[in-house]
């Protein structure tokens, strides 16, 4: 269920963040709409040396919900990205552990669609709800995609036994 005014509320929050984000004090934050600032101020204001798990880390900088914690609060973590193109950038941009993987509920073979040109943040697993994204790619010749079969990994298989995750960010463009 989505509230009928959610779209407009999101646009208003984005405009506020765009304006607020122009201030010098907000330059340290990296998320798309100030999520990292809110998470920091509400939950982790004085918390240093935490541990994050970032699913959908993209290039490690653009829209990152965890980079602030890594750079400013001495956190460590694991940044995971499925796109081969973006993973190369992620490895260069982050000092935390990076992992190229497609995360799933269970280990299985899936088709991964990588957008290598155009809407590159829209790469994802090709399943029934992804058909709308594929239609968008087909409608715009600027988008170039590559499909490949991959084996998913589970979050449990990535984390060591007893590992405590303080903050988990899942940013996979509506495919959560």
What are these regions (language model features)?
Residues 1-176:
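Phosphate/nucleotide-binding beta-alpha loop and adjacent structural elements of enzyme active sites
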């Amino acid at each position: 269920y989505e509230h009928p005014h959610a779209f407009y509320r999101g646009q208003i929050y984005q405009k506020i963040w765009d304006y607020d984000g122009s201030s010098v004090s907000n330059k340290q934050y990296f998320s798309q709409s100030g999520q990292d600032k809110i998470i920091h101020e509400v939950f982790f204001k004085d918390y240093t040396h935490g541990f994050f798990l970032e699913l959908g880390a993209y290039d490690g900088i653009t829209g990152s919900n965890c980079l602030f914690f890594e750079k400013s609060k001495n956190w460590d973590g694991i940044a995971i990205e499925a796109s081969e193109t973006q993973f190369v950038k992620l490895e260069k941009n982050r000092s935390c552990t990076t992992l190229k993987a497609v995360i799933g509920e269970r280990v299985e073979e899936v088709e991964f669609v990588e957008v290598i040109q155009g809407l590159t943040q829209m790469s994802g697993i090709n399943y029934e709800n992804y058909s709308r994204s594929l239609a968008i790619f087909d409608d715009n010749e600027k988008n170039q995609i590559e499909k490949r079969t991959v084996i998913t990994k589970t979050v449990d298989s990535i984390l060591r036994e007893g590992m405590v995750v303080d903050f988990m960010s899942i940013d996979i463009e509506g495919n959560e």
